[in-house]
């Protein structure tokens, strides 16, 4: 899979990176690089992000257990269970984040 880039600046959420939930085993790397001061968390959804009715605001988002609320530094995590979408939620600060999402096996 081609690496996907996500970004936030100020209090915002990134676009959604699509994940292939049919791959076994699931192995997704999420690397978040922080510039300046920002607080963020990595979130994932099981909702159908390709549905015509999908909106980020109406989707059910779960915090990644390792990079849950309150992260402030450059970090990475793995997702090893089926998900359909991944995003970054910047909850505080005027800084920014640049994130790379890479899924192995496809």
Indicate where each model-derived feature is located.
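Residues that flank catalytic or metal-binding motifs in active/ligand-binding sites
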Residues: 26, 38, 84
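Acidic/polar N-terminal loop/beta-strand segments that form early-domain functional surfaces
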Residues: 33, 45-47, 59, 91
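Extended, low-complexity, turn-rich repeat/linker tracts enriched in Gly/Pro/Ser/Thr and Asp/Glu
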Residues: 31-40, 92-98
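Short, surface-exposed beta-strand/strand-loop-strand elements in extracellular ectodomains
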Residues: 37-56, 100-105
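Structural beta-strand segments of beta-rich domains
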Residues: 24-30
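Surface-exposed loop/edge segments in extracytoplasmic proteins
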Residues: 2-5, 49-64
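Beta-sandwich interaction modules
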Residues: 6-23, 60-106
């Amino acid at each position: 899979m081609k690496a996907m880039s996500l970004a936030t600046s100020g209090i915002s959420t990134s676009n959604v990176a699509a994940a292939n939930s049919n791959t076994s085993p699931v192995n997704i790397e999420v690397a978040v690089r922080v510039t300046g001061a920002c607080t963020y968390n990595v979130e994932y959804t099981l909702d159908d992000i390709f549905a015509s009715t999908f909106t980020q605001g109406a989707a059910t988002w779960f915090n990644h257990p390792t990079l849950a609320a309150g992260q402030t530094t450059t970090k990475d995590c793995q997702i090893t269970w089926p998900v359909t979408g991944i995003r970054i939620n910047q909850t505080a600060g005027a800084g920014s984040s640049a994130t790379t999402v890479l899924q192995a096996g496809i």
